Amino acid sequence: MTKTLKDHFSIIRSREEVITEIYNTADLLYVYEGWTEEQQTLFLDYCTGMRGIKILYDQFFKLILSPEQYPERLESILSAILNEPVKILQVLPNESTRIAAEKSLLVLDIVVELNDRSIANVEVQRIGYAFPGQRSACYSADLLMRQYKRVKKSKRKNFRYSDIKKVYTIVFIEKSASDFHKFPHTYIHRSKQQTDTGLQIDLLQEYIFISLDIFKNNLQNKGISKDNELEAWLTFLSVDDPKWILKLIETHPKFKKLYLEIYEACRNTEVFMGLFSKELLELDQNTVDFMIDEMQDTIDAQKVEIDSQAKQIAEQQLQLNEKDALIAQLQKQLAEK
């Protein structure tokens, strides 16, 4: 008999229990009936273990992986990604200069300072941006400049450029752009600047792009390695299929505690419904923003095409005018003969 999440987590309630509580509580029922049928089903699936929650979505991430409350968990993720032990000194205010079009695609965006004073920005994109390199470079430069201003203000006359530390931009992508799919077996791409001579100059900015959809495709083929900490975390962050959740807690038992916390939260229907509602509001607004951005991109592309066609027509008209002038000149010459 196939095991379910309820077999591992006895605190998971049945669908009937959750629905009964909702219909017996006026405030809960009011919120519940404000959702679409699809959203109601998703909420019940979360509460009853039929589907795992999306850990990387902002509200759920804060529930389980908040760097303020559980710094050791995000430290473990960053250590696995950066291939070195890290400690989080503090969570920095995210004074992001992102334009609204960029924010519409983000479901998580946090900035932390590590023990060596380097900065790590962790973001999750629902859909991979166009021009990911250019966008990430601009945001990384913004973080670097903010660090420079903060350190210079703090150190004053004792400031040295050696006080400026690395800025890591770590991007998780749920649905990768087509360029990433040219590498179907590679889901982590690391980038940093270097000279063409081998001269070692630390230019401070490093980028790591992690394609979660490509990771899951590879996971289907090779399974979860017992000895790979990074793969274990990526599985936890990306999968919502109970089958893979069960495989994860079998190969890496430490994740059972995290899932237990999730299902303990699910038992408080009022609190979990509040988290779910906030996430729906953010996703709905982000979807609207994204659709507007897409429409604007389409309009801009059409305008470019129309301008190009108008230019071609003008050039063709000019050529016709020149031909007409030439014909008129030849006709005049023939008439004079």
Model-inferred region functions:
Residues M1-E206:
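Accessory alpha/beta interaction modules
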Residues T2-R51, A120-Q125, T235-K337:
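Short, charged alpha-helical interaction segments and adjacent helix-coil junctions
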Residues Y57-L65, K155, K216-Q220, W244-L248, ...:
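Short hinge/gating elements
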Residues D58, E72-E75, Q134, I164-V167, ...:
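Non-catalytic, well-ordered alpha-helical scaffold segments
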Residues T97-S104, L219-N221, K257-L258:
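Short, solvent-exposed polar/charged micro-motifs at secondary-structure junctions
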Residues N158, I214-F215, I262, R267:
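Selected N-terminal structured segments and early membrane-anchoring regions
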Residues H181-F183, L219-I224, G274-L275:
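Short conserved micro-motifs at the rims of enzyme active sites and ligand-binding pockets
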Residues L203, Y207-K256, N268:
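An acidic, glycine-/histidine-flanked metal-binding catalytic module
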